[in-house]
């Protein structure tokens, strides 16, 4: 649903001043356009993060081309990189944002027997909550392998000390709504992609005294 047509009648009409707060606005012009707001009627106030950068480092590790034409050939490279990260963090819980069930399955089958017991994963949406609960309830260094938990979950402190974002999460252009919104506003497509990355990044560091490393 495009919220722009509903923002004023359903939200803004309840007050003379409205405060919208978010850690993931990212690009104010695109955000305002998505809500149908006139930039001349909005004041944008930026506040610095209270989370120290040294406690939430990002490591860039390009290892595979996961576009449609290269996915099949390069999936083993990605899986090998995830296995290496599991070995690098033998005593720490982590989360692997796989982007799709196909990628998640390829990683799952590539994990060697000595590490497979650490994996907590699901093969469709119905298993999502059970996989998350299995990860959180296990005191051991489990690794949550999922394509669908970039937002809405809290992996604070020891629930995740490292995470991997396996692929740039471009929205699926086969979705008619996505295709129509990109055609109308190309900036929205890039903004939505960056938003998903930032949301995934935020799953593991939940407070100023938390810490986790993110691999891209």
What residues fall within each predicted segment?
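Conserved helicase motor "Helicase C" RecA-like lobe of SF1/SF2 P-loop NTPases
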Residues: 94-124
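A contiguous, basic/glycine-rich beta-loop/short-helix subdomain that forms a polymer-engagement track
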Residues: 1-65, 125-128, 132-134, 142-147
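Conserved interdomain hinge at the start of the Helicase C-terminal
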Residues: 9-13, 60-99
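Short glycine-/polar-rich loops that comprise or flank the Walker A/P-loop
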Residues: 14-16, 39-42, 54-57, 92, ...
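Conserved RecA-like P-loop NTPase helicase motor core
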Residues: 62-73, 123-216
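Phosphate- and divalent-cation-binding pockets in alpha/beta enzyme and binding domains
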Residues: 28-30, 103-107, 154
């Amino acid at each position: 649903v495009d919220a722009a047509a509903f923002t004023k009648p359903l939200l803004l009409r309840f007050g003379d001043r409205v405060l919208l707060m978010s850690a993931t606005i990212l690009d104010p012009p695109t955000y305002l356009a998505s809500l149908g707001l006139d930039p001349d009627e909005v004041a944008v106030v930026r506040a610095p993060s209270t989370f120290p950068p040294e406690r939430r480092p990002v490591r860039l590790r390009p290892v595979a081309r996961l576009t449609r034409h290269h996915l099949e050939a390069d999936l083993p490279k990605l899986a090998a990189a995830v296995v290496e990260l599991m070995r690098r963090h033998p005593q720490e819980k982590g989360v692997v944002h796989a982007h799709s069930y196909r990628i998640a399955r390829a990683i799952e089958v590539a994990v060697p027997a000595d590490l497979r017991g650490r994996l907590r994963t699901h093969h469709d949406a119905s298993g999502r909550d059970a996989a998350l609960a299995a990860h959180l309830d296990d005191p051991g260094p489990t690794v949550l392998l999922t394509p669908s938990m970039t937002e809405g979950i809290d992996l604070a402190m020891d629930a995740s000390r490292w995470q991997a974002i396996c692929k740039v999460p471009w929205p699926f252009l086969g979705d008619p709504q996505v295709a129509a919104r990109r055609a109308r506003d190309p900036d929205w497509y890039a903004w939505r992609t960056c938003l998903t990355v930032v949301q995934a990044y935020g799953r593991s560091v939940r407070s100023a005294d938390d810490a986790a490393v993110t691999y891209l």
